[in-house]
């Protein structure tokens, strides 16, 4: 009898062990796969509201997303809160029981919800000890103080600011205007959520889209950083002479390229690449584009991470480009075959118009590569995942994207960009005691009478012995308050100056 009881006991223990193992597997190891089933998406989001979701935290320790317990709601035990919602909306995204997740909330969902394999030990311990399941915390690269400075500097002007550490690709700040409050989409009231969603989607300013990384714009003269790099990489120098006419006649057409204000570039009958860059002379850079050719321009743009496209299809990249955890509309530049037999488009593309498209994140990466001796890092937004008790369980190290230009070309480009700020179109970015390198841009778009976008891209400190620690790109749409009279030097450069000044001296 005792033997039978012992066998029965062993059998029951084994069965309970198998049952426990299966439950543990489902709750710990298979949760992510089950959550990924589209049929379970809505059900899974509601189920996640029973878990205390992890926090999203800036590099300097500011909590920008957290979960708080609700009262009297058996289904939604927690609600998501964003203490400075509009300021960080482009980073956090939203977490909504109706409309799902976006940005970091989506990209890092398995960690935030506690379902990632790296959190298996923590989740299993909670299960064994009868503690409620908790999500992990996501540590971002964002500098909360600099984010506030960038937002204040941009003000209510529609546009965006991106700041990057060139050494590792860390996104220090990423702001966009107009923005939205993710708290409106993350409440317990589904009717209020839907009303906010309809209002936001009906807004012609599209506040749910980030100008920093979601949209694309003509880069204008900031693209001359790429055209100049192509020239330097192909044997030309900063002092190479170029014919200096009043305007450039485009081959096979009656059209011309003119400099800003119809002026002639300084230098006399001939001028140099350096002078043309410092004064942003369209005529000379049209010549440079024609001289180096479509292949060299396309190769250089694509090396900087611009997506190769074959117009009129401008939607799909023809090869993988920059990796980023949240949605990123990488820059666009046509394949060389697009320009075959069409030299005018080569000249126009060399000055950042036609099918050239970019956003502040893309252009900040270009500046970062120049600042970093020609080596471009992948943009990094998340550095660590921590378990609910604060222990680091996963790290995301910096990753090199590529070497779009040589160190020698980067050194020449740095000197040229320093001259833009010291004596050219970017003097509004000067900071006492600091050497700043930059490039202005005034990008035409739309039809006649449409105000241009104002650009400024820069990095600092940029002295001969300095190691640059910040690169900034600013766009102000439609010239901001100056409208059709705006230039990048007038409108965007002062914004970038405030960001760099705050980061390096404030």
Where are these regions (language model features)?
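Beta-lactam-recognizing serine transpeptidase/beta-lactamase-like catalytic domain environment
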Residues: 167, 171-221, 226-478, 488
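Periplasmic/cell-envelope proteins involved in peptidoglycan metabolism and beta-lactam response
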Residues: 1-194, 204-221, 239-240, 295-303, ...
């Amino acid at each position: 009898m005792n033997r039978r009881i012992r066998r029965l006991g062993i059998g029951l223990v084994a069965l309970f062990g198998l049952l426990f193992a299966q439950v543990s597997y489902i709750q710990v190891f298979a949760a992510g796969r089950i959550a990924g089933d589209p049929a379970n998406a809505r059900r899974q989001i509601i189920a996640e509201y029973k878990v205390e979701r992890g926090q999203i935290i800036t590099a300097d320790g500011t909590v920008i997303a957290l979960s708080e317990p609700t009262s009297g709601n058996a289904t939604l035990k927690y609600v998501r809160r964003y203490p400075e919602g509009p300021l960080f909306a482009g980073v956090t995204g939203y977490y909504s029981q109706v409309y799902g997740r976006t940005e970091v909330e989506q990209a890092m969902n398995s960690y935030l919800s506690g379902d990632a394999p790296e959190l298996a030990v923590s989740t299993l311990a909670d299960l064994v000890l009868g503690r409620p399941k908790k999500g992990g915390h996501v540590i971002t690269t964002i500098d909360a103080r600099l984010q506030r400075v960038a937002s204040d500097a941009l003000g209510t002007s529609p546009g965006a600011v991106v700041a990057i550490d060139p050494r590792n690709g860390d996104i220090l700040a990423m702001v966009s205007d107009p923005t939205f409050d993710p708290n409106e989409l993350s409440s317990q009231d589904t009717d209020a959520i839907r009303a906010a969603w309809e209002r936001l989607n009906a807004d012609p300013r599209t506040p749910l889209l980030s100008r920093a990384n979601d949209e694309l714009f003509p880069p204008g003269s900031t693209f001359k950083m790429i055209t100049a790099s192509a020239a330097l990489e192909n044997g030309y120098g900063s002092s190479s002479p170029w014919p200096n006419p009043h305007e450039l006649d485009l081959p096979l057409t009656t059209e011309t390229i003119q400099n800003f204000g119809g002026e002639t570039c300084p230098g006399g009958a001939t001028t140099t690449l350096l002078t043309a860059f410092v004064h942003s002379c369209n005529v000379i850079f049209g010549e440079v584009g024609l001289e180096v050719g479509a292949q060299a321009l396309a190769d250089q743009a694509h090396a900087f991470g611009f997506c190769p496209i074959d117009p009129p299809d401008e939607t799909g990249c023809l090869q993988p480009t920059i990796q980023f955890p949240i949605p990123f509309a990488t820059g666009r530049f046509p394949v060389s075959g697009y320009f075959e037999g069409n030299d005018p488009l080569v000249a126009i593309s060399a000055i950042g118009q036609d099918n050239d498209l970019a956003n502040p994140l893309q252009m900040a990466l270009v500046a970062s590569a120049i600042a970093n001796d020609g080596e471009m890092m992948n943009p990094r937004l998340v550095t660590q995942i921590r378990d609910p008790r604060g222990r680091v369980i996963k790290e995301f190290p910096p990753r090199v994207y590529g070497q779009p230009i040589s160190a020698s070309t980067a050194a020449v480009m740095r000197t040229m960009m320093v001259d833009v700020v010291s004596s050219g179109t970017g003097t509004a970015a000067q900071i006492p005691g600091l050497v700043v390198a930059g490039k202005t841009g005034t990008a035409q778009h739309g039809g006649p009478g449409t105000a241009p976008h104002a650009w400024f891209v820069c990095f600092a400190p940029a002295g001969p012995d300095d190691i640059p620690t910040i690169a900034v790109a600013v766009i102000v749409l439609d010239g901001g308050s100056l409208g059709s009279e705006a230039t990048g030097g007038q409108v965007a450069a002062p914004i970038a100056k405030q960001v760099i000044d705050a980061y390096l001296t404030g």
